[in-house]
Amino acid sequence: MTSRIGVITFPGTLDDVDAVRAVRLAGAEPVELWHADEDLKNVDAVVVPGGFSYGDYLRAGAIAAIAPAMKSVVAAAERGTPVLGICNGFQILQEAGLLPGALTRNEGLHFVCRDIYLDVENTSTAWTNQFAEGTKILVPSKHGEGRFQASEETLERLEGEGRVVFRYVENHNGSRNSIAGVCSENGRVVGLMPHPEHAVETLTGPSLDGLGLFQSVLSTLVS
């Protein structure tokens, strides 16, 4: 039976179509979810994609975090459903309380758009278990507010518990500890700023490395 992965669309979402394609290329059935609907249609996992939900008013991700669909995502995550937040989706998961830290204006206050290398630091999460230890992946990065910030106590906890999932090889936005992505305590909720869904085809992406995240969650769902 094919796994079903939901992709949420908010007003201002940009990368939902790309996430849907990545899910399909990985071998799962994508299910389009609307922000105003509480019904997650019995999906097996959820992707919260990037963009500028609600125009980033108040704070990036702040309004989207209280949308009906996100209330259901929080409840599903608490039951163990795998959830991936990409870029603005990462911000939304933080605002919803599913992931720690905050994402602020980039160092230098410029929007950055380039292909970057990430170290995969934790290969045991629901979204990274198909990567080998020590793997570097090449994926696009495009954001103006991607600088990971957290208190010293939170940073120590994340590092000590192995919850830093991705780390920038070259820290291009000033993130604390070069953190690009983190996970929940159980490793089933992952958020990262760069865009794996844009690295799934050689024609349009810098590599196929992004497919690994979507293939990993399929492995999680069938295990």
UniProtKB/Swiss-Prot annotation:
It is found in: Cytoplasm. It holds the Pfam family GATase_5. InterPro entries: Class_I_gatase-like, PRibForGlyAmidine_synth_PurQ. PROSITE patterns: GATASE_TYPE_1. Part of the FGAM synthase complex composed of 1 PurL, 1 PurQ and 2 PurS subunits. Keywords: ATP-binding, Cytoplasm, Glutamine amidotransferase, Hydrolase, Ligase, Nucleotide-binding, Purine biosynthesis. The gene is purQ. Residues 4-223 form the Glutamine amidotransferase type-1 domain. Part of the phosphoribosylformylglycinamidine synthase complex involved in the purines biosynthetic pathway. Catalyzes the ATP-dependent conversion of formylglycinamide ribonucleotide (FGAR) and glutamine to yield formylglycinamidine ribonucleotide (FGAM) and glutamate. The FGAM synthase complex is composed of three subunits. PurQ produces an ammonia molecule by converting glutamine to glutamate. PurL transfers the ammonia molecule to FGAR to form FGAM in an ATP-dependent manner. The keyword Cytoplasm applies. SUPFAM superfamilies: Class I glutamine amidotransferase-like (SSF52317). One of its GO terms (cellular component) is cytoplasm. Pathway: Purine metabolism; IMP biosynthesis via de novo pathway; 5-amino-1-(5-phospho-D-ribosyl)imidazole from N(2)-formyl-N(1)-(5-phospho-D-ribosyl)glycinamide: step 1/2. This is Phosphoribosylformylglycinamidine synthase subunit PurQ. CDD domains: GATase1_FGAR_AT.
